[in-house]
């Protein structure tokens, strides 16, 4: 660990010197680095897909959709839009401040720490890295040890493409993360669990370092069968895809549980079963399209969630586990107890509880008994229900009539609220995430108002009162001695 401490200290010293040199403030440099990330992904597509298969059993199509494609688009958007993002924003000042001028400029924080996650180890590393570079920072990326092949790829390949004095990669486990967090950073970006997020935030507080925490939570899906019955097949496919089709439920925005009226629950279950088979075949364990569970620890965690006798009794499909093959069968539960652990912990796996309600409007109350989720999904064409969801719940995002697609849309901010996260990124929001917006005001020495200065009197007090109210006509009368 002494060697790692020295490595971290030397990396920090070099990155700070590089930032102080001003090199990273050049838009040309930023575009070149982002372009290099694009080329790195394009040149190494097969290697990346192989790493993701080795780590998580991801099919190459899923890997491109959820990881490589995301990074390539992020890089393209950043290069094409960076000039516009970086332009100072001129502010229209109130007449009260005439003839002063105001603007806001985006300046980089400095040296940034990015701590990425294991479930999407390429996109959750390179996406924030692109944002940090676009804003002009130097960056140290700590990849996740739980995706060792993807982590090794990043550690080996990034230095071959990017400026090694400004952008560095360090591998390692919690002990390395602890060393990193003992140092002062200008910004910390973390993707992971709320439990670790609290540790990150506590460490950042020692230096008053700003943080962005991309966490998770139990993302509910409301199914209002009354208004979407004509499209129910699409609804079922989207729910199944949102639970099992993206890292096998190991995603912070996966469908965690479904809320549906009791009368329609059997129909939904009967439609989900053949949909799962159409996606993954009769034996999902042998399917090349179903990602595996990350490691034995997570298999055991999921097994523990299912071990509650009350939860066992609610299994209506699946439930088998093969720890040696890191396999948990796609599983459907019908009405597990709301006080069970599985209904109070983010599942992060291929288990789908279906919770029934008498009336779909009651689903809002159930959502509000839990911490604010990263996403709420609702399949409905009822405008009143949509309005209630938006006004009576709080979440990082709300998506109607689809699932997870909001993550791909860089025109929208992505981030949580409360226990599901702090801050937002994607597209322009990534640039803002890694930038400090500095207010600039340029005054004039050509006009000086004595009302600003002591000694105080009633005239000056009246002047100040009117100025705060922007009562300009009355101010003129006051100055002309026509109103007191």
Swiss-Prot record:
Class of enzymatic activity (EC top level): oxidoreductase
Keyword annotations: NAD, Oxidoreductase
GO cellular component: endoplasmic reticulum; plasma membrane
Binding site for NAD(+): 192-197
Single GO molecular function: aldehyde dehydrogenase (NAD+) activity
Tissue: Constituively expressed at low levels.
Enzyme nomenclature, EC number: 1.2.1.3
GO biological process assignments: aldehyde metabolic process
Entry annotated with the keyword NAD: yes
Protein name, entry field: Aldehyde dehydrogenase family 3 member F1
């Amino acid at each position: 660990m002494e060697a790692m401490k020295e490595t971290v200290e030397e990396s920090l010293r070099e990155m700070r010197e590089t930032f102080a040199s001003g090199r990273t403030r050049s838009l040309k440099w930023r575009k070149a680095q982002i372009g290099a990330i694009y080329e790195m992904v394009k040149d190494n597509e097969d290697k990346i897909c192989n790493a993701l298969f080795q780590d998580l059993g991801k099919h190459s199509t899923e890997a491109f959709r959820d990881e490589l494609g995301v990074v390539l688009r992020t890089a393209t958007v950043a290069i094409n839009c960076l000039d516009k993002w970086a332009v100072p924003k001129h502010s229209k000042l109130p007449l009260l401040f005439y003839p002063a001028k105001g603007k806001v400029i985006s300046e980089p924080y400095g040296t940034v720490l990015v701590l990425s996650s294991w479930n999407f180890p390429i996109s959750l590393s390179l996406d924030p890295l692109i944002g940090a570079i676009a804003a002009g920072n130097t960056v140290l990326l700590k990849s996740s040890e739980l995706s060792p092949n993807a982590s090794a790829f990043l550690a080996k390949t990034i230095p071959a493409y990017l400026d090694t004095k400004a952008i560095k990669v360090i591998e390692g486990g919690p002990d390395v993360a602890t060393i990193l967090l003992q140092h002062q950073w200008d910004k910390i970006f973390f993707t992971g669990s709320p439990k670790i997020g609290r540790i990150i935030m506590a460490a950042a507080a020692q230096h008053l370092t700003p943080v962005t925490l991309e966490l998770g939570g139990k993302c509910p899906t409301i199914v209002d069968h009354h208004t979407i019955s004509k499209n129910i097949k699409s609804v079922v496919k989207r729910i199944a895809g949102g639970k099992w089709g993206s890292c096998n439920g190991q995603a912070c925005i996966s469908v965690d549980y479904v809320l549906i009226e009791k009368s329609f629950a059997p129909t939904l279950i009967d439609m989900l079963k053949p949909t799962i088979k159409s996606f993954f075949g009769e034996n999902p364990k042998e399917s090349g399209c179903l990602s595996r569970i990350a490691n034995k620890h997570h298999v055991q965690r999921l097994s523990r969630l299912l071990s509650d006798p009350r939860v066992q009794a609610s299994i209506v499909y699946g439930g088998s586990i093969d720890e040696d093959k890191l396999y948990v069968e796609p599983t459907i539960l019908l009405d597990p107890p709301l006080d069970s652990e599985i209904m109070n912990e983010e599942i992060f796996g291929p288990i789908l509880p279906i919770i029934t309600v008498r009336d779909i409007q009651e689903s809002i109350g159930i959502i509000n008994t839990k911490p604010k989720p990263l996403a709420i999904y609702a399949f409905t064409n009822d405008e009143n229900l949509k309005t209630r969801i938006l006004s009576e719940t709080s979440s990082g995002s709300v998506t109607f009539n689809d699932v997870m697609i909001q993550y791909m849309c860089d025109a929208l901010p992505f981030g949580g609220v409360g226990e599901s996260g702090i801050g937002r990124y994607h597209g322009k929001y990534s640039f803002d995430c890694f930038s400090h917006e500095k207010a600039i005001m340029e005054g004039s020495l050509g006009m000086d108002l004595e009302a600003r200065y002591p000694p105080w009197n009633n005239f000056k007090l009246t002047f100040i009162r009117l100025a705060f109210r922007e009562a300009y006509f009355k101010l003129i009368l006051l100055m002309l001695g026509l109103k007191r």
